UniProtKB/Swiss-Prot annotation:
Phylogenetic lineage: Eukaryota, Metazoa, Chordata, Craniata, Vertebrata
Recorded GO CC terms: apical plasma membrane; cell junction; connexin complex; intercalated disc; mitochondrion; nucleus; plasma membrane
GO BP annotations listed: cell communication by electrical coupling; cell-cell signaling; heart development; microtubule-based transport; neural crest cell migration; positive regulation of transcription by RNA polymerase II
Complex and partners: A connexon is composed of a hexamer of connexins. Interacts with TMEM65.
Name of this protein: Gap junction alpha-1 protein
Compartment(s) of residence: Cell membrane; Cell junction, Gap junction
Extracellular side, ranges: 45-76, 185-207
Main location: membrane
Length: 379
């Protein structure tokens, strides 16, 4: 028989990406089929045609009678069965290799983007997309196989085809020569001159091997059915439990720096953005109750720069107690999708900014209030 090392190496790689039932099935395939077929079975059928003797001297009669009794050798039939049954598993392995290649490309792209990010480039959104794709194409999670999506469908289809091939080969074997061998075969076929009797060597030994291989096929079929029900039940159970969507989980876990640095993100999380209205000395901004831990260390340098700009502006104006400019007093102009605060959690609704004047009235303000203005009404 040929060398099974190439097929063995390929099937050995499937062990890392199979369930417990799949690993047991591969063990049955290796131990009770490939190894047994390469050692004991081949030696038992080594002389099947040479030891097939008919009681006639007619040339060619033994050959045609052997062809009628055994359309295909049992050994070659079982080799075909192993190849057909292993093909769906190899196709599943090809899908696994495809996903591994996708993951390698994403890793290389992520390294390139991180190098760009270290140089000051803004690639946060691209890194977030790569994280989502890696979650989709990833193969291992906490040491376990992540079998979902297309990979799960491929695995279920491979189990179905393996089961169909097992049933098909069992039916074909029963149709061609049954599950036992007789010691005498009667043949009446040209060029035999009359009905002749042909004798088979070691029929009992060969019958034992036939039954053994039949039992192995039935066990393999049962493992496939059990694994199919288990995988289907597991996927349905996960769907009923309403597991969190992996993409939304990834979106929550991976928040880009661009969004965290935006004024809208800061406002809705209770943080002061660099472009938010500033309160001059003596004033206090009230924005509602927020979580102080989420605002910690938020754009500290930008806030200091804004205060420096504000002080410079006040010095240029020469008015120590001037009111807040209209530029700083303008409300936020958010897009429509952020103005609906009904969807926010209770206790975190947006509250309008209110300015509490806690400073004492100054002389400058009193004099400024008594100065006549052009638009005042005369009494």
């Amino acid at each position: 028989m040929g060398d099974w090392s190439a097929l063995g190496r390929l099937l050995d790689k499937v062990q890392a990406y199979s369930t417990a039932g799949g690993k047991v099935w591969l063990s049955v395939l290796f131990i009770f089929r490939i190894l047994l077929l390469g050692t004991a079975v081949e030696s038992a059928w080594g002389d099947e045609q040479s030891a097939f003797v008919c009681n006639t001297q007619q040339p060619g009669c033994e050959n045609v009678c052997y062809d009628k009794s055994f359309p295909i050798s049992h050994v070659r039939f079982w080799v075909l069965q192993i190849i057909f049954v292993s093909t769906p598993t190899l196709l599943y392995l090809a899908h696994v290799f495809y996903l591994m290649r996708k993951e390698e490309k994403l890793n290389r792209k992520e390294e390139e983007l991180k190098m760009v990010q270290n140089e000051g480039g803004n690639v946060d959104m691209h890194l977030k997309q790569i994280e989502i794709k890696k979650f989709k194409y990833g193969l291992e999670e906490h040491g376990k196989v992540k079998m979902r999506g297309g990979l799960l469908r491929t695995y279920i289809i491979s189990i179905l085809f393996k089961s169909v091939f097992e049933v098909g080969f069992i039916i074909i074997q029963w149709y061609m020569y049954g599950f036992s061998l007789s010691a005498i075969y009667t043949c009446k076929r040209d060029p035999c001159p009359h009905q002749v009797d042909c004798f088979l060597s070691r029929p009992t030994e060969k019958t034992i091997f036939i039954w053994f291989m039949l039992i192995v096929s039935i066990v393999s079929l049962a493992l496939n059915i059990i694994e199919l029900f288990y995988v289907t039940y597991k996927s349905i159970k996960d769907g009923i439990k309403g597991k969190k969507d992996p993409f939304s989980a990834t979106n929550d876990a991976v928040i880009s720096g661009k969004e965290c640095g935006s004024p809208k993100y800061a406002y809705f999380n209770g943080c002061s953005s660099p472009t938010a209205p500033m309160s001059p000395p003596g004033y206090k901004l009230v924005t509602g109750e927020r979580n102080p831990s989420s605002c910690r260390n938020y754009n500290k340098q930008a806030s200091e720069q804004n205060w420096a700009n504000y002080s410079a502006e006040q010095n240029r104006m020469g008015q120590a107690g001037s009111t807040i400019s209209n530029t700083h007093a303008q409300p936020f102009d958010f897009s429509d999708e952020h103005q609906n605060t009904k969807k926010m959690a209770p206790g975190h609704e947006m509250q309008p900014l209110t300015i509490l004047d806690q400073r004492p009235s100054s002389r400058a303000s009193s004099h400024a209030s008594s100065r006549p203005r052009p638009d005042d009404l005369e009494i």
